[in-house]
């Protein structure tokens, strides 16, 4: 098995694409409030937190399976196609992966959304597992965001 790879996952949710995309854009405020077990804080260290070049420091809660802190830089945002890419630039994850770049795309589908997530990585050593735990955490978060948004709609 090589040191580099890519993981992909698709998740269908009931929330409309526009609503889900807005929630992702407000993750700095929304995630620690709505999902305190997963996110303790998200601080903006540079930029506005959403534009390319922005840097965010994420302190994870007990629900995070791999790391407790990471810094990520927003690499690209495509508002029209509801897509954003980020790179991990600091924190414990760099002990396992020399590089990690994630991409999230929100696509309208049948009144809900199709979420596509991919993670490109380069491991620090052959013994390191592929980051399936990170992929699974992303899927869990997508489902939690959907549940949260659906509760807000029905409230």
UniProtKB/Swiss-Prot annotation:
Domain of life: Eukaryota
UniProt-listed SMART domains: Bet_v_1
Pfam families documented for this protein: Bet_v_1
Entry-linked InterPro entries: Bet_v_I/MLP, Bet_v_I_allergen, MLP-like_ligand-binding, START-like_dom_sf
One biological process term in Gene Ontology: defense response
GO molecular function, one term: abscisic acid binding
Cellular compartments per GO CC: cytosol; nucleus
Family: Belongs to the MLP family.
Designated name of the protein: MLP-like protein 423
Organism per entry: Arabidopsis thaliana (Mouse-ear cress)
Biological classification of the source: Eukaryota, Viridiplantae, Streptophyta, Embryophyta, Tracheophyta
